[in-house]
């Protein structure tokens, strides 16, 4: 089985840590969810701490987990600068093996990254096992049908023109040390039969208009239907599924760009407990 293919390393991780630092409507949405569903919580795919840091600043008990040690290193640096302390775990979602059990696990924009359906299924099962009874697993998924380029790239004539050329130009952003960084991406291939797209990202680092470093990473993206994700959640043991749109309380419709899935751990699947569960969530013998 292949490992997840993602691109959150090196210069790309540095870009995310420098410029992708502000949360949008998802910030308040997941904050309210944690306050309602309970703590401790786990930010699955926490990246450089875009959501994790403000949640900690709000006084919530939230751990972080990410597959990329590069981006977790940036998250640690940001936490230290702000005087914040939490647990950060460098693990893949499908291999989740943490010492705590959570009342809330949420995943922002990471379901489908890696391009392997079986890994996503395993990740859901691992999330189920890491929840306390009645715990909540929530994630958002950006639909492809409202993204014309992504949708059209499935057509035979579009697939034949792949891989795309790199964009001829890109905006450079200035880093604190005076260097400039730019990111561009392109589609390499699409497979409508497997519902997978393969994309590349190129990061370039400039100093006084001289290119001093270039990195290229490849990422596979799974595409799912709403019903497929529901079936996967149910197979993992989740029940009481709710699906909302665009980080609101509106029931999801075809006009929404982001679907938010909220699922509860099914008590009927629980075996007789073999571990004491203290209030802080740590499993002890």
What are the roles of these predicted feature ranges?
Residues 121-133:
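A short glycine-rich, Lys/Arg-flanked "PGG" loop and its adjoining helix->strand segment in the class I
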Residues 138-228:
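SAM-dependent methyltransferase
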Residues 52-95:
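Class I SAM-dependent methyltransferase SAM/SAH-binding core
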Residues 107-110:
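A short beta-strand submotif of the Rossmann-like class I SAM-dependent methyltransferase core
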Residues 45-47:
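Class I SAM-dependent methyltransferase "Motif I" SAM/SAH-binding loop
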Residues 97-105:
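A short acidic, Gly/Pro-enriched loop at the edge of an enzyme's catalytic core
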Residues 1-39, 50:
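Conserved class I S-adenosyl-L-methionine
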Residues 217-285:
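C-terminal lobe and adjacent flexible extensions of AdoMet/dcAdoMet transferase-like proteins
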């Amino acid at each position: 089985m292949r490992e997840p293919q993602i691109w959150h390393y090196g210069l790309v991780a540095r870009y995310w840590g420098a410029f992708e630092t502000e949360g949008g409507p998802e910030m308040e949405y997941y904050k309210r969810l944690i306050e309602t569903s309970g703590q401790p919580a786990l930010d699955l795919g926490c990246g450089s701490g875009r959501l994790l840091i403000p949640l900690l600043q709000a006084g919530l008990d939230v751990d972080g987990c990410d597959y990329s040690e590069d981006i977790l290193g940036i998250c640690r640096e940001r936490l230290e600068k702000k005087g914040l302390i939490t647990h950060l775990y460098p693990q893949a979602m499908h291999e989740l093996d943490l010492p705590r059990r959570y009342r809330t696990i949420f995943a922002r924009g990471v379901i489908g990254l890696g391009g392997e359906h079986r890994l996503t299924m395993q990740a859901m099962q691992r999330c189920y096992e890491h929840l306390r009874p009645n715990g909540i697993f929530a994630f958002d998924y950006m639909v492809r049908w409202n993204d014309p380029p992504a949708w059209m790239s499935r057509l035979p004539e579009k697939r034949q023109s792949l891989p795309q050329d790199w964009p001829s130009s890109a905006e450079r952003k200035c880093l604190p040390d005076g260097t400039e960084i730019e990111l561009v991406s392109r589609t390499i291939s699409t497979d409508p039969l497997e519902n997978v797209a393969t994309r590349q990202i190129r990061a370039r680092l400039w100093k006084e208009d001289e290119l001093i470093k270039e990195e290229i990473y490849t990422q596979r993206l799974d595409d799912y239907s709403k019903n497929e994700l529901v079936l996967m959640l149910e197979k993992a043991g989740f029940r009481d599924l709710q699906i909302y749109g665009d980080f609101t309380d509106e029931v999801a419709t075809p006009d929404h760009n982001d679907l938010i899935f909220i699922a509860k751990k099914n008590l009927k699947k629980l075996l007789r407990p073999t571990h004491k569960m203290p209030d802080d969530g740590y499993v002890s013998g």
